[in-house]
Regions:
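Post-transcriptional modification and biogenesis factors for structured RNAs
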Residues: 1-213
Length: 213
């Protein structure tokens, strides 16, 4: 679950919904949204992620919002004076994946001031992203996307690198002969086949290379 505490702008909630659905998440929980709920401005900025908004649940307290969860993380951009383990978004995502069927949630604070300590106390662990120490500010949807993407990519099997080719068919012999003729003309024009005694063997070798391919 993605839990937004005291979200101020409907537009931000909509962008959070968009970030969530990008990564396959739909459980959005709102604690005391400032402008009430539902909010038409959220739908406008969700860019089609209305499913998340329609299923969003509203709570009066953070305690109510996390009451059914087994594992809760609190996000913050600064150190807090409390004894809690601090993990990176990557580690948090791995731990959420590892607990399997248990219910997990991530807390995000208000846009202007972040999260109060009384809310962080409810979390099992704190998540701090290792960003530029001189500037760690993220907007709400950026913070959600950062965590959601780390969770999503652990179950994604997309290769890290690939060359995508258009649909092709094997070349006909006629097409291969035309290719050879064009290639040999170009090689001749650049002097690559200038040694007449070696030319037949070189042409034969070049054709064999393409025929094997």
């Amino acid at each position: 679950a993605i839990i937004l505490i005291d979200p101020q702008l409907g537009e931000n909630i909509g962008m959070v919904a968009r970030a969530m659905l990008n990564c396959g998440l739909t459980d959005l929980r709102l604690v005391r949204p400032r402008d009430g709920w539902p909010n038409p401005r959220a739908s406008n900025s969700a860019s089609g992620a209305d499913l998340v908004l329609e299923c969003a649940k509203v709570f009066e307290t953070t305690i109510d919002a996390v009451s059914d969860l087994n594992l809760v993380f609190a996000t913050t951009a600064r150190d807090r004076d409390m004894t809690k383990e601090i993990v990176t978004p990557e580690v948090a995502a791995r731990e959420i994946r590892a607990v399997g069927s248990k219910r997990c949630g991530i807390l995000f604070g208000r846009e202007s001031k972040g999260m109060k300590n009384e809310d962080i106390v409810l979390a099992n662990k704190i998540v701090i992203a290792p960003l530029n120490p001189g500037f760690t500010s993220l907007n709400l949807s950026q913070a959600v996307l950062l965590l959601a993407y780390e969770w999503h990519k652990l179950a994604d099997d997309t290769p890290s690198s690939e060359l995508r080719m258009k649909d092709t068919r094997p070349a006909t012999k006629q097409e291969m002969l035309l290719l050879f003729e064009h290639l040999e003309r170009e090689l001749d024009s650049h002097g690559f086949l200038r040694v007449k005694e070696k030319r037949p063997v070189m042409v034969q070798n070049i054709r064999n290379v393409f025929q094997r391919a």
